[in-house]
Amino acid sequence: SHLTPASEHTMLSTTARPLIEATVPVLLANGEAITRHFYQRMFTHHPELKNLFNMGNQASGNQAQALAGAVYAYATHMDQPQTMAPALNRIAQKHVSLGITPAQYTIVGRHLLASLGEVLGAAITPDIAEAWDEVYWLMATDLIAREARIYQTLRWEAGQAWPEVRVVQREAASADTVALTLQALPGHSLP
């Protein structure tokens, strides 16, 4: 697979479309196994990325379900961009809050596509892998553009550290998670 942003087009190619439609059910049925394998693989190769993920959601499988759900929803609703806009906006906001950079999409794409082949084996032919690579990069390019607009609005650079903030509320969200309500200091903004 090419593993480069699909900036040359914004729609799924006619060769990829039937492959995606035919394989969505198989990938949905194996989505959690694929994404769990993906996270393990990516964190083994890039342990520095662990701090971007809620490890409680990793352990529970919520993160794996969220990633699988987002990619498959995108693949099945690509012809109705308005359907995916609210979810993509939420994902972009979350990514900006974490300082996600465009370069990190290459890492994610590489490990996600490799995980498809490693979990599903021979069922993932080169043509099917290329079709899913295309879907991934269409979604990634969309998210990168949304995130760029948010960064521009905030006058931040992608990956920029958060400004100093004031904690105005602290509450236990679960046994191992604390939720903080933050307030920007004068002259600063939050995503």
Q: Where do the PLM segments sit?
A:
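Short, Lys/Arg-enriched N-terminal segments with co-localized hydrophobic residues
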Residues: 1-10
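Globin-like tetrapyrrole-binding proteins
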Residues: 11-162, 167
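Ferredoxin-reductase
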Residues: 156-191
